[in-house]
Design a protein with these regions (language model features):
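Short beta-strand/loop element within the Bergerat-fold HATPase_c
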Residues: 134-171
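Short conserved segment of the HATPase_c
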Residues: 184-195
Length: 246
């Protein structure tokens, strides 16, 4: 029998909610438990489980689309503004270029928004990691172990950038998300779209597999390219979405 992940997730989520409620009741009647070592870890672990269950359900439903007429010029500009506002308190330079005459065509805008914000969020994480590494005078965090003579003057002037570009090419809509962050190690490139594979300190490893699944359900492709970009071994990573125009 085919395993219904959504049903399993629902069955697990119910007792998980009860556990969380019980913890809150214990804290309310016995505030001293907040001082117990690792008590806060319980909340973190439960939140992680809830996130995992939500992403499992989303992954299971990734190929089920609810398409509607979508004006990609308006749609992508809204995403650009939304992301720009989320990083306004950082030093990240966000460069958005939405070319004119993008198509109006059927698409699941809710799921595509999820994909694009996930890719932009990953880019944000990558440049912030790189910025933190540089500000601490450490070796480049770009998986370049051979470079032990990092020019700290360059490290201190590191300028995080994220590029969001959309254009029409022949009969395809192309959207790319690029960053000059910490990059992806060559040995990891072939596995980042596999479920539960993650090279972050946190995360479920379902974000990129779900993103690719959603794009493929639209008849498109999601690819990644990561290569050395600057002399101090910063890497540039680009994720490219290609969606056919009907």
């Amino acid at each position: 029998h085919r395993m219904d992940i959504s049903t399993i997730s629902h069955e697990i989520r119910n007792p998980l909610t009860l556990i969380y409620s019980t913890l809150q009741m214990i804290e309310a009647s016995n505030p001293e438990v907040l001082n117990i070592r690792h008590w806060s870890d319980l909340h973190s672990d439960i939140e992680y489980m809830k996130q995992l269950l939500e992403e499992l359900s989303a992954y299971n439903n990734g190929q089920r689309l609810s398409p509607s007429s979508t004006d990609f010029d308006i749609f992508l500009k809204k995403i650009s503004l939304s992301f720009a506002s989320s990083i306004i308190e950082t030093d990240i330079e966000f460069i958005s270029r939405i070319e004119p005459e993008l198509p109006v065509m059927p698409a699941d805008s809710i799921k595509l928004r999820e994909v694009l914000l996930n890719l932009l969020g990953n880019a944000r994480d990558a440049v912030l990691i790189q910025q933190s590494t540089c500000s601490n005078h450490l070796d480049s965090a770009c998986n370049c172990e051979s470079n032990r003579s990092l020019d700290t003057s360059k490290a201190l002037t590191y300028s995080p950038q994220i590029h969001f570009h959309a254009w029409k090419e022949h009969s395809n809509l192309i959207i790319s998300v690029s960053d000059n962050g910490c990059g992806i190690a060559p040995e990891h490139l072939s596995s980042i779209f596999e479920p539960f594979v993650t090279y972050k300190s946190s995360g479920t490893g379902l974000g990129l597999p779900l993103s690719r699944r959603i794009i493929e359900a639209h008849g498109g492709t999601l690819t990644v390219h990561s290569e050395p970009d600057l002399p101090d071994c910063q890497l540039k990573t680009t994720f490219t979405l290609t969606i056919p125009i009907p």
